[in-house]
Amino acid sequence: LPYRAADDQPSIEKLLKTLADRYAWTPVFEGENIIAVTKGKYSINIESGGQLELSGAPLNDIHHTQRELKHYLDELRILCKEHGAGILGIGYHPTAPLPARPVVPRTRFEALADQGARHDMRWGFLTCSVQANYDYANEADMIKKLRVGLALQPIIVGLFANSPFVEGKDSGYRSYRYQLNTRTHERQQTRFMELAFSDN
């Protein structure tokens, strides 16, 4: 969806404003542009390519998280149907080319786009993911959880690979998002892995 559109066309702006009006979300603006909505301890933000991001509240277990996600998706599906839009939970946009500028008019995204020569902007504009944060009791517990998470990462990528298409064509990868991530952040990730599994 475009950020802004004619009266009879769907847009991200209209979707967020309707969420705020109908379901008691509080709109967040940058200048005159709505860029997010919040409710209690969670929020819906827009990323640079127009991706919607649910930032959930801290919850006790995965079942509470699932209920929160279902509630969010139920509201979103109703509005998307009314606005003639759809939801696609996928790691990389299957048909869109790389846009020249961010879809969403935010100062932060414009600044990142201006640094595009130093970053692969496909990462910000065309990818989506699930990010999970885990509490820890102490430093030893944190290290253990970090190492387990990193060790399981290739298996998780294989289980949830869902981004085989790029600009309408088969990319040759089951998870093009993972391939792009590896290529974009290879040096940082290599150093991080060395630190995470070092003895000291």
Where do the protein language model's features map onto the residues?
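Terminal catalytic/cofactor-binding subdomain
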Residues: 1-118, 126
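Loop-rich catalytic cores of soluble enzymes, especially ATP-dependent carboxylate-amine ligases
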Residues: 92-200
